[in-house]
A protein has these predicted regions:
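Basic, flexible Lys/Arg- and Gly-enriched helix-loop patches that mediate nucleic-acid binding at interfaces
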Residues: 2-239
Length: 239
């Protein structure tokens, strides 16, 4: 008779890798799941888990003293309004994006951030590997924004941003600019593959401009499309 522990080490199609299970259950990457396994905080049937171990649906997995349950891959696209924080905890009474979601989705984590004064597309997922691939600079996931400036952008500054980038304290910032409307020097389509904190606002501020509106429309293969402000849509994961 096969015991649960023996079943965990099999390689047939009825099993899955432990690190994948842990990653989805905790919303972390598989690399982070492997680190938890190495640290000895994950058990399978009350036995210390092993790297590379496989499990079945009958195995009992715990992280610390907390039982972990199987989770399906989830991804939602949220249209964040201005005035909401991409955080679980409210600060000074400012609402968070989780107040726009049903409690059944509160386990999802945002992929990147938009500051309180910005609006547009936010991805939330329980897949840590997907989040890593969408946010790490080495994967070059393009993001698209509609940006309004407090004054017309000078041609020299546009060329500087497009061709050379702007030096910031945390390194050069390279953006691609295109007018939203011909002849309008206030409103720009900004594309970038990085995602440093308030990078667009800081880039323009370094040249003497204030961003009065910042709205994200696209993130990688995902677009806001017709999702209304404050609402969300569930979709499938693609990178």
């Amino acid at each position: 008779m096969t015991t649960p522990t023996q079943a965990s080490d099999s390689t047939d199609s009825s099993t899955q890798r432990l690190n994948k299970f842990v990653a989805l259950a905790l919303g972390v990457s598989r690399r982070q799941a492997d680190e938890l396994i190495e640290q000895g905080t994950v058990t399978v049937n009350d036995q210390p888990a092993k790297l590379g171990q496989r499990i079945t649906t009958t195995d009992i997995i715990r992280h610390g003293n907390k039982p972990l349950t199987a989770q399906a891959h989830q991804l939602i696209l949220l249209h964040k309004p201005v005035g909401y924080l991409c955080s679980r905890a409210s600060q000074g009474g400012v609402p968070t994006i989780y107040e726009l979601l049903p409690t059944s989705l509160h386990h999802l984590k945002p992929v990147g951030r938009l500051d309180k004064d910005s609006s547009g597309l936010i991805l939330l997922t329980n897949d840590g590997d997907f989040a890593h691939q969408m946010t790490h600079p080495s994967f070059y996931k393009m993001k698209r924004y509609l940006v309004t400036l407090d004054q017309p952008l000078q041609p020299l500054h546009r060329q500087m941003i497009n061709d050379f980038g702007v030096q910031l304290p945390d390194g050069p910032s390279r953006l691609t600019l295109e007018r939203q409307h011909e002849g309008d020097e206030h409103r720009w389509i900004v594309q970038m593959s990085e995602g440093r904190n308030r990078q667009i606002r800081r880039t323009f501020a370094a040249l003497g401009y204030a961003v009065t509106k910042l709205h994200r429309t696209d993130f990688g293969n995902y677009a806001l499309d017709d999702i209304k402000r404050g609402e969300f849509a569930e979709t499938s994961l693609t990178t």
